[in-house]
Amino acid sequence: MNSNIEDDPWSSGWNDDNDNNNNNNTSINDPLTGATATTTPYQSSYLTSSQLFTSTGGGGSGSGGGYNSGVNTYNTTIPPNLINVPSSYETIYSHFITKYNNNNNNNNSNSTFTLNDFEINIIDKLISLNYLTNYQKQKILDIIYENNLLPINQSFKFYQILGLLALEIDVPGTGDYVTLQFRLNNNLPDLPEKFINEIINEENEQEEQTSGLLGNRNRSIQSHSHFGPNNQDDWNIDDSTTISGGGGGGGGNFGDPLLVDHSYIHDDLIDESRSVGGTQPQQGGGGGSGGGSGSGSGTIAPNVDSSYIEKYINDIKDQFKPLFSGIDLIKIKEVPEKEGIIFKHINYMITHDLKIGGTSSGTKKVIRRYSDFVWLMEYLLEKYPFRVIPGLPPKKFTGASPDSQFLQRRRRGLHRFLNQLIKHPILSQEPIVQSFLTVPTDLTTWKKQAKIDSSLEFKGQKIQTDFINVIWPIMGEPFLKKWRQAEENIQFIIDKWVKIIILVERYERRQQQISFDNGKFAEMLNGFSKLNTKIYPDNEDNNNSTRNDVNVNVVVVDNNENYKQDFDFNSSGDIININQCLNSIGEFFNKSSQVLIDESYIINTKTLEKFKNYLDYLNSLQELFERTKQLSINQIDLLDKRIKDQEIKFKKISEENPDIKGGELIKLRQSIINDKQEIFQQLNKDWLIKQCCLQEFIIFQETQFLITELWVEWCKDRLKCQEKLVGLYDNLNQEIIHDMPLER
């Protein structure tokens, strides 16, 4: 009745079984490739978290990887082709891609040319030739990640990165993204000729010493994951086909950094003895383990049994109760008066009896605007990007019909948003959420004097050793596989559920139409019974007509009394009995019409909302997948490679001539220490993200019972309706069988 979803799925071949081959299905956007996703004709018009975030300009980044709306990390625009590419760029690109393809052909591999290879073979070479400094290198790498200049093997992005390097070499400080775009296709500087010659004349031994162009990071990964037959390293397996790390491998990560397990790096940093003084990680340092005695993902504590893991899972699930159970925790209604001098807006009254935020028991009422809901969602996205956050209904529906219908749909969407928030075990404890539901004053005024901390939820936290050493070794592999499987299929599941909602709405509209038709039945039968005696005259009608005509009556009575008695057409009064039964049938249609109206109301206000509530959870999970791909990007592999290369260099210089190059050794040692501190911070964040996503995935499993709840109630409500209709049919049947004549 009030659907915001496309009405006719049949026109698009909606019942095809081959959903995976259907071009109408939406593919998951990949922020690393910049691929433009196709859209499905069944997209919900509800505002999802990523849509809201990308449409707003607010929200600074939290520590450790929060949202930063000013950074273009999810650019899916297909860029135009570069023209006037400097010849040096083409030389470099041709040189590396040719060697890359030849190496793939020789080794029968299908590995990917990564940014790590670019850094080793180009950026580090420029540093060794004193064209760039390490600070400038880090600045360029940050620009690459922030502006999505990946994957590196695309010529357009390869040339842009070379342009950044050339600009920085030409005039230090100008190697930024804005300057690059301004000078794109117009007068980009050439790379130094000396550098070009060095690259072209590079010897094979030097290429091997720096891990080579095709130095695949997963060679090291495979050596730690024991993946493959006979525990042999497979040098040709890349990230696109393998998830490796603690507990074994799983499917490809298709651009999702969450699916890369860095447990092997944690093992290296903890277990290997570093010869560079003072770089051994400390107990509980800001790194991935939180301690130096853990066994890592490769070893499972011998005393861990399945009951411990089951308790861990059940404890998380017990915190989340998504079922309605006939209770609305929070109610919301529109305040009749529209406020605003020029631009009118709707206020919403939120009512609840929740005891939250240290408030006393009793009913609480607060007034909020739609913009207040938007602010709350922006805050949650910034602080809890790795949580399942429900979406908001849009400010305005596309093609919204009557204003009252639009407002009703938006109010219901806000109602679902608040009830899903308050049922979430983490979000419900957020002070801002509690203040939103309890502060009686205007929220804009309250925000001016309130202290609001929007930094990432696990800022300053360290991952627990129990998670790394006990939970992850057992749950890591199956979780990554199930996460990937869910991420691949979530859009198809959403499409199916949207079509189910369409059918429910059609069923409701049909019940309304049947109710309308039943009313027409009663009206037409009543009119028919009043007129049918004109063609089926009975004895009573004949007597009435003779009394009204005195002259005729006199003649008839005096001269033709016997003939009059013989001339009656329907002396038995059958038409009267028939009309009385027709009136009973009309009453049946009126009563059944009311039953169908009641059923339609229940579907529209209760059943359909539960179907859409479950759809909201599906959309929220899909949004979590997309945010995780965007925000869990890290440089762990790059840092690990750089540390190992620097340690090799440190050892080599120490053995050759430590006295002469003492200053260089000090700088190198400090660089190693800095990189280790950075990698431990990034490992810690990576572990915390994985822990958070694992918890959310476990919590989401409880939503499966929403499917049971809504279909059980669907059946109960339909049964009640049918029982009422059957009772009406039975009474009508008994009446007309005995009272409606079939013959004289």
From Swiss-Prot:
The keyword Cytoplasm applies. Residues 26-40, 218-243 have a biased composition (Polar residues). One of its GO terms (molecular function) is phosphatidylinositol-3-phosphate binding. It is found in: Cytoplasm; Membrane. Keywords: Cytoplasm, Membrane, Protein transport, Transport. GO terms for cellular component: cytosol; endosome; membrane. Belongs to the sorting nexin family. This is Sorting nexin MVP1.
